[in-house]
């Protein structure tokens, strides 16, 4: 079977997933590819492990931006691909290999046939954590090339190839990591009265957290707290001195995020008093909601529906987290789901996006950018 140029690029990238801010091989791959395109109209900047590329327009009045996240996840791959990850314990399980490939395809088209406006491509590291969008947005490297309009996409396993889905306004939730470390006094299992058990304390905390959403968030709003990991103790006959909870908070409104965190802090303070222990809360990476610019999104959906071969679906908002939300706080723009028809979902070890979606995305995005690049 003959593999197209951009499918091969995706497969090359799929082999080398890297954790946030350590995407050195990915960065070099992107730079090497751009080097094959370079001409007098292309400028390149390196920012940490990311890459920023500008294609000068013929008669620029604005700057259109495309953002692609480039990092992988600490997941052991189970796809059975011949081109599976060569980095043990790492996988492109969220489609960032496709996001990057589509960006390189769109860049190739932009160099081949320049539009009136300038185009800026942001190959952004660390979306999965600790978050690269905000520091890239604030960087000196981007300051003089800051887009006036920006767009981004995310693969959607549940939608068929040839489909995009988006909506005006709120698309993705506010998200925050949650880490709670408890420290008390350990001891022998035969003498529980001389210790204060941090496994019991952690268990009480998990149980109490379940009421935060149901009794503090408007039922017409949406929020969720998930505790995904608990660690504590050493062996079966020693009362644990320490325990740790790890989870996430997701809310559709900024106000709910603030309220939920306030209640978590009050409950943790109660655990400290009840179990005579010390507690430390760390919110880790926090991502602002993805809020699509209404007029630009409406215009994009209409264009794609009427002037391309893609099908457009108006979706509902999702509890997904995306640091692209920080860029949309500063720059008008939008994000959309790209259908890739995979049996397994995002962050799954068996995620297998349909590669046909790659060239379909490049083609219709090139159509959109050329159209948008000739409009005021």
Curated annotation (Swiss-Prot):
Active site location: 69, 128
Domain of life: Bacteria
EC number(s) per entry: 3.5.1.47
Family annotation (CDD domains): M20_Acy1_YkuR-like
Catalytic activities: N-acetyl-(2S,6S)-2,6-diaminopimelate + H2O = (2S,6S)-2,6-diaminopimelate + acetate
Record-linked Gene3D superfamilies: 3.30.70.360, Zn peptidases
Pathway note: Amino-acid biosynthesis; L-lysine biosynthesis via DAP pathway; LL-2,6-diaminopimelate from (S)-tetrahydrodipicolinate (acetylase route): step 3/3
UniProt KW Hydrolase keyword: yes
Keywords associated with the record: Amino-acid biosynthesis, Diaminopimelate biosynthesis, Hydrolase, Lysine biosynthesis
GO biological process: diaminopimelate biosynthetic process; lysine biosynthetic process via diaminopimelate
UniProt-recorded Gene Ontology molecular function terms: N-acetyldiaminopimelate deacetylase activity
Keyword Hydrolase (UniProt): yes
Record's function text: Catalyzes the conversion of N-acetyl-diaminopimelate to diaminopimelate and acetate.
UniProt record similarity statement: Belongs to the peptidase M20A family. N-acetyldiaminopimelate deacetylase subfamily.
NCBIfam families to which the protein is assigned, alphabetical: amidohydrolases (TIGR01891)
Name of the protein described by the UniProt record: N-acetyldiaminopimelate deacetylase
Organism: Bacillus cereus (strain ATCC 10987 / NRS 248)
């Amino acid at each position: 079977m003959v593999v197209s140029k951009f499918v091969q690029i995706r497969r090359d990238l799929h082999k080398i997933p890297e954790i946030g801010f350590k995407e050195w091989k990915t960065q070099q791959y992107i730079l090497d590819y751009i080097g094959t395109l370079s001409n007098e109209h292309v400028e390149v900047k390196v920012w940490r492990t990311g890459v920023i590329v500008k294609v000068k327009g013929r008669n620029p009045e604005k700057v259109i931006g495309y953002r692609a996240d480039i990092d992988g996840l600490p997941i052991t791959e189970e796809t059975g691909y011949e081109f599976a990850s060569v980095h043990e314990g790492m996988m492109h399980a969220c489609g960032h290999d496709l996001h990057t490939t589509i960006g390189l395809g769109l860049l190739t088209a932009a160099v081949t046939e320049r539009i009136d406006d300038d185009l800026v491509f942001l190959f952004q590291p660390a979306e999965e954590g600790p978050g690269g969008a905000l520091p890239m947005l604030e960087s000196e490297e981007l300051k003089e090339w800051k887009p006036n309009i920006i767009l981004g996409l995310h693969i959607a396993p549940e939608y068929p190839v040839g489909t995009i889905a988006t909506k005006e306004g709120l698309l993705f939730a506010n998200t925050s990591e949650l880490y709670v470390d408890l420290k008390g006094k350990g001891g022998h299992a035969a003498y529980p009265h001389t210790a204060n058990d941090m496994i019991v304390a952690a268990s009480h905390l998990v149980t109490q957290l379940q009421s935060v959403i149901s009794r503090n968030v408007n039922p017409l709003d949406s929020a969720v707290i998930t505790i995904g990991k608990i660690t504590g103790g050493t062996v079966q006959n020693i009362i644990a001195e320490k325990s740790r909870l790890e989870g996430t908070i997701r809310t559709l409104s900024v106000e709910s995020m603030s309220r939920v965190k306030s209640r978590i802090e009050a409950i943790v303070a109660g655990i400290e008093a009840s179990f005579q222990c010390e507690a430390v809360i760390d919110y880790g990476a926090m991502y602002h909601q993805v809020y699509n610019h209404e007029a630009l999104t409406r215009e994009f959906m209409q264009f794609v529906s009427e002037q391309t071969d893609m099908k457009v679906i108006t979706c509902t908002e999702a509890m997904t987290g995306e640091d692209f939300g920080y860029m949309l706080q500063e720059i008008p723009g939008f994000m959309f789901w790209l259908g890739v028809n995979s049996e397994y979902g995002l962050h799954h070890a068996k995620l297998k996006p349909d590669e046909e979606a790659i060239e379909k995305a490049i083609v219709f995005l090139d159509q959109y950018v050329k159209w948008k690049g000739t409009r005021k």
